[in-house]
């Protein structure tokens, strides 16, 4: 009996991208109404855990920041600090109209006109507030985008 040595045809890049796209650990950063929908997305009906999405309370354990709600000028430095404390590789998902562009409070002097003015954003979930299904879809799209991006780059 002769064993062939080519039974493992998986590159290191594919292995790393597969592991990363299946284990998002988002930081809970809820600021307004969208935070309620983010909490709603964690119940058993949607079951984020089966996709490896486990919410974390500290930025050092997270690799995804979900900005859910209105970002005010006073909250902007805290958001930037949390982004800087999150370990690389990290991704940002902006959830809701207020986080995307100011939303209903766009013309207020105290509101940042989108969290992309403070930190780089990888995925946007529109609507006010987006449903749990929309957040679920956004996370799945981010996982697909991550798989494509890592396959294009060479890790080793």
From Swiss-Prot:
Stored Pfam families: Oxidored_q6
SUPFAM superfamilies registered for this protein in UniProt: HydA/Nqo6-like
Names of required cofactors: [4Fe-4S] cluster
Localization: Mitochondrion
Superkingdom of the organism of origin: Eukaryota
Principal subcellular localisation of the protein: mitochondrion
CC per GO annotation: mitochondrion
Keyword Transport (UniProt): yes
InterPro entries per record: NADH_UbQ_OxRdtase-like_20kDa, NADH_UQ_OxRdtase_20Kd_su
Keywords: 4Fe-4S, Electron transport, Iron, Iron-sulfur, Metal-binding, Mitochondrion, NAD, Oxidoreductase, Respiratory chain, Translocase, Transport
Catalytic reaction list: a ubiquinone + NADH + 5 H(+)(in) = a ubiquinol + NAD(+) + 4 H(+)(out)
Positions with a binding annotation for [4Fe-4S] cluster: 33-34, 98, 128
Cofactor note text: Binds 1 [4Fe-4S] cluster.
Molecular function GO labels: 4 iron, 4 sulfur cluster binding; metal ion binding; NADH dehydrogenase (ubiquinone) activity; quinone binding
Record has Electron transport as a keyword: yes
Enzyme Commission number(s): 7.1.1.2
Similarity comment text for this entry: Belongs to the complex I 20 kDa subunit family.
Cited NCBIfam families: nuoB_fam, PRK06411.1
Full protein name: NADH-ubiquinone oxidoreductase 20 kDa subunit
